[in-house]
Amino acid sequence: MIRSRQPLLDALGVDLPDELLSLALTHRSYAYENGGLPTNERLEFLGDAVLGLTITDALFHRHPDRSEGDLAKLRASVVNTQALADVARRLCAEGLGVHVLLGRGEANTGGADKSSILADGMESLLGAIYLQHGMEKAREVILRLFGPLLDAAPTLGAGLDWKTSLQELTAARGLGAPSYLVTSTGPDHDKEFTAVVVVMDSEYGSGVGRSKKEAEQKAAAAAWKALEVLDNAMPGKTSA
């Protein structure tokens, strides 16, 4: 039984015809198990282009002094599999994954929370919004959903990822290199990883993810923000 998709539409802030919404949510594994139904891959292709143009335009106007190379790096920090998957997980109270139509095998191996599937599903929804409502509505939805990522992009380091940014921050403050303690739970096909960042023998952030890399990135982001907040309390720092 397919659960109500209204919370998903409410989170997107648009209405979509049932047929178009179902297509946007149909993963190829489900299509193949059900007689070769159409998949969401064409919509994903379209949504990728709409997302890329919208983010590129936003960055171009937000950062008039940045070079082409810098803008490309900023865009890559916003438009990537992990960022898209994170937006998808926060899309509504239950996340996008529970609404994606998956084949039994994919569903049984944690496909509903697989970053690649969530990212593809997010792009296919954006493609569907563009088809139904046009570019301006698609742009409005994208800027609302990806606004926090656009805001955070300029704060990231040269590598445009949180681990690089944290390492640069701790080095600049003479705190040494951060270390990561990673644990995992669950069976091999459905593991959940938890990472904790340690700086100068103190824990500054933690993160949970479906992969070690994802958990470490989330932990690094939390630690970076914590260190920024505690700037004046860091060793070697004095209050103004």
UniProtKB/Swiss-Prot annotation:
The keyword Heme does not apply. Residues 19-134 form the RNase III domain. Its EC number is 3.1.26.3. Its cofactor is Mg(2+). It is an enzyme of class 3 (hydrolase). Keywords: Cytoplasm, Endonuclease, Hydrolase, Magnesium, Metal-binding, mRNA processing, Nuclease, RNA-binding, rRNA processing, tRNA processing. One of its GO terms (cellular component) is cytosol. It is found in: Cytoplasm. PANTHER family: RIBONUCLEASE 3, RIBONUCLEASE III. Digests double-stranded RNA. Involved in the processing of primary rRNA transcript to yield the immediate precursors to the large and small rRNAs (23S and 16S). Processes some mRNAs, and tRNAs when they are encoded in the rRNA operon. Processes pre-crRNA and tracrRNA of type II CRISPR loci if present in the organism. Belongs to the ribonuclease III family. Was identified as a high-confidence drug target. This is Ribonuclease 3. The lineage of its organism: Bacteria, Bacillati, Actinomycetota, Actinomycetes, Mycobacteriales. The gene is rnc.
